[in-house]
Amino acid sequence: QCYIMTGFYTAPGETVTIPLMKGISPELMKVNDHDDITRWWEVMDRSTGQPVPPEQWSYADGSVTVQAVPFHEYTVSFLAYLIWDPVHMYNATTNGWTNFEHQITFDVRQPKTHKYSMERLRKFIAEHPYVNVIRYTTFFHQFTLIFDELKREKFVDWYGYSASVSPYILNQFEQEVGYKFRPEYIIDQGYYNNQYRVPSKEYRDFQAFQRREVAKLAKEMVDITHECGCEAMMFLGDHWIGTEPFMPEFKTIGLDAVVGS
């Protein structure tokens, strides 16, 4: 899933209604209103920099209505499902593909998906005995890549962590760090903690947590690869969040090689 922030909306009176998916491709993302929105979403009064209490806003038909202070600016930070893999969407759009099925990403951190992925890896190696190098492209989480309704690139950050989230992951993060997660830790006033920003302690905590968890899971796949008699190579690029070679956790994965595009 991915954290997204709406545009800034100025309240013309005592209420303001904010459409969530304006400027975002409906083929790429779908609003996650399944999980507790009062827990995982955040409405911000950007004029004061303070969150709006959940009892002062409501969601219906793809929009959030806020009990507002006139002329203050508001945004909504919300979770969205990635219903089309951003890299596949990029390739399809760039190359003008037609008549094809959209690929989706799945969360290997979830127990059932984790089990399936490890079994699938063993099955692939067993069924392809002529293969002696497994090249992973890459491990698990895509960097931030968002398209608008016309399938144009709206926002890209090769180092962005905003698409590496889910309530399952964030609950684990809270248990480890001992404080409550806020969407603003990732949204960062709409800057999404891009590389020109000074990261907050909370965002750095989240990055460190993600790197540890991703490295642990990637090592499991590399160990299976070695156990089955193959070398493990990582493509440096797509879905590489948490496997940055310049970070200390990377060396624990045990890869034999890294290749770039």
Enumerate the predicted regions with their spans.
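Polysaccharide-binding and catalytic clefts of secreted carbohydrate-active enzymes
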Residues: 21, 25-255, 261
